[in-house]
Amino acid sequence: MKYLEKHPMIMIVIGILGISMSAILVRFSSAPSAVTAAWRLCWTVLLQTPVVFGKVQFRRELMSVNRKTALLSVVSGVFLALHFFLWFESLQHTTVASSTIIVCTEVIWVSLGFWLFLKGKLSGKAVAAIAVAFLGSVMIALADSGMGGSHLYGDLLALLAAITVAVYMLIGRIVRSGVSTTVYTYLVYTACAAVLLVMCLVQGQSMVAYGMQTVLIGLLLALFSTILGHSVFSWCLKYFSPSFVSASKLCEPVVSATMAAFLFGEIPGALQLAGGVLILGSVFYYARLEDK
């Protein structure tokens, strides 16, 4: 661990590879989106449980969580469940590049929500970044419109996935002031897993009807995308600025799209690439503004 503390860039690279695997693994799943997402969250909760209950500090904190924090964590888990379902479903209808790029606009939606509901400030430069990101999304939609209605539907699902994860992030800003990251994420992931299991039940989908491949994909998503992805980036905040960590996450669409090009033959067109550059550039610019 001391070696990694001296060379934290290694963890940045691991984090990028971890989150970039998510879209690819989802594509390999033959199960419905709700089932794949449910397995990911069930494995995540299972892997996190020994950490939470194995440490007295976290165990005591979990048992002393007040009603407001618990309720907000459940609501946050509902929106996170919607995010996973919508994004996984999006990947069944549009390209990996389009889906991952559009989901990256979550930062923009967080800023809008912060301004609208939490009385945050939104500068003129931030508004310009949002406008450019919107233009990029329109360009991707135009590029995908030539591929058929299913691709546009996938783009819309990715946009809704970005908005729902933004709500999850906004609730986190409120709750995190009174609870540790470990306990908060455990509460949210547990609620998220429960919601996804209910979705499977309502849709009449069995968790065990799609073979061991789906179970394994869920485990790999939990390990790579959650633990070696998002959790690693949280660790990196100790050594890098928030803007650098945010900018590093923007490598996800690039790496995912590159893997999709080799694995699925998905080669982005010129308009799609241009829209992607506008979105990623505007999100990077906004992340720099946030850091200042």
Positions of PLM-derived features:
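Membrane-interface interhelical linkers
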Residues: 1-17, 45-75, 88, 121-127, ...
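Glycine-/small-residue-enriched transmembrane alpha-helix faces in small-molecule transporters
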Residues: 1-39, 44, 78, 86, ...
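Hydrophobic alpha-helical transmembrane segments of multi-pass membrane transport proteins
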Residues: 17-21, 25, 51, 74-93, ...
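Helix-loop interface residues and adjacent transmembrane-helix termini in multi-pass membrane transporters
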Residues: 30, 93, 119-121, 178, ...
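Juxtamembrane helix-start motifs in multi-pass secondary transporters
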Residues: 36, 181-185, 245
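Hydrophobic transmembrane alpha-helices of multi-pass small-molecule transport proteins
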Residues: 48, 74, 122-144, 162, ...
